[in-house]
Regions:
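Carbohydrate transferase catalytic cores enriched for Leloir-type hexosyltransferases
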Residues: 1-353
């Protein structure tokens, strides 16, 4: 009998951001495959919360946490197995491994990270590139990683993100009352308080429209331990919503005048697609990854140009924009967790056939 493919479940010990969302949704999509119960096994640290699955069994591995669990305990358990690592890290000595590296930010924008973190991950990525098979989430990241890791672009597979997880979810409209947003006009921005997410430019743009009742709702705005903090201006119209459930995010997006996505550098960018599936217009920074993902379904601005962003916000406030919303829905339909999972599933066979 063929040994099952092990899935690196370290992501279940980490806060939910875009990379962890990718891992969760890809595993759920793999779990829907008819053969998943025999083909895969999810390996998680002993203290991690389990991911509810129907077919794929889960095994817990004790031992030290973090990178040590991955490099020692998981590496030992996986030595006779193929391994799927979905969050940009994995045992560096394991050759029959497919690793999804989401972007080249530690190479291209090391200023956005704490120096030791950026250095460690540049070393890790280079070692993985020598031993493992790589995938990423966009054509842009494929080109970036190929350049910094000295690989041919076609040596790196592309299995994109999606927003299917928000497609049919019932919105929890109680969040509008809880945040005092019922009946108000507001924009949503999703991300953490790090320089890369560039939320300060959205706050500066907010100061330009002469509307004291307009709000900017920051969802998931928190600091991480690996990036440098970006301070927000003190404006009572900025609503710090914190981490929210998917039904709450769906309600916030459905009620918003638009999503503002002002990132300086991304490998993909899930929030614009999440907005599109909820019928929310998108204003995005004009950077390669967002152009690839959003195409003609978003309004764009230079990521440091708060005046241009304010102008795009006024455009949406003067809506409605039914044609743009339909374009957004069609764009979001181009991305599917199931299709991306199928790409990775096939690659796990073809890479070691």
């Amino acid at each position: 009998m063929t040994e099952p493919i092990l899935i690196n479940g370290r992501f279940l010990t980490q806060p939910l951001s875009g990379v962890q969302r990718y891992a969760r949704e890809i595993v759920r999509a793999l779990d829907r495959l008819p053969h998943a119960g025999l083909r895969y096994r999810l390996m998680i640290p002993s203290g991690a919360d389990a991911l509810p699955l129907d077919r794929i069994p889960t095994s817990r591995l004790s031992g030290p946490g973090g990178h040590m669990w991955e490099q020692v305990r998981l590496a030992d358990a996986a030595r006779n197995h193929r391994l799927l690592s979905l969050c940009g890290a994995g045992p560096v000595g394991h050759s029959r491994q497919l690793v999804v590296i989401h972007d080249a930010a530690v190479f291209r924008r090391p200023d956005l990270f704490k120096p030791r973190y950026a250095l460690a991950h540049r070393i890790l990525d280079r070692r993985l590139a020598r031993r493992a098979r790589l995938a990423t989430v966009s054509r842009f990241s494929q080109g970036e990683l190929a350049a910094v890791l000295n690989l041919a672009p076609d040596a790196i597979a592309v299995a994109p993100n999606s927003a299917d997880h928000l497609r049919d979810i019932p919105p929890d409209t109680d969040i509008l009352r809880a945040l005092n947003l019922a009946g108000r006009r507001y924009f949503v921005a999703v991300g953490n308080l790090t320089p890369n997410k560039n939320l300060a430019v959205a706050a500066r743009a907010l100061a330009r429209p002469p509307d004291p009742d307009l709000r900017l709702v920051l969802v998931g705005a928190h600091l991480t331990g690996v990036t440098r903090a970006s301070l927000m201006p003190d404006d009572p119209r900025i609503v710090m919503a914190g981490r929210r459930t998917d039904p709450e995010v769906a309600a916030l997006l459905r009620g918003a005048a638009g999503l503002v996505f002002p990132s300086l550098y991304e490998g993909f960018g899930i929030p614009p697609l999440e907005a599109m599936v909820q019928g929310c217009p998108v204003i995005a920074s004009d950077i390669p990854a967002t152009r690839e993902v959003c195409a003609d379904a978003a309004l764009y601005f230079g990521p440091t140009d708060d005046a241009a962003l304010a102008d795009r916000m006024r455009t949406l406030l003067n809506g409605p924009h039914p044609a743009r919303l339909e374009t957004g829905r069609r764009r979001a339909d181009a991305y599917s967790w199931s299709r991306s999972a199928a790409v990775l599933d096939a690659l796990l066979d073809s890479a070691w056939s």
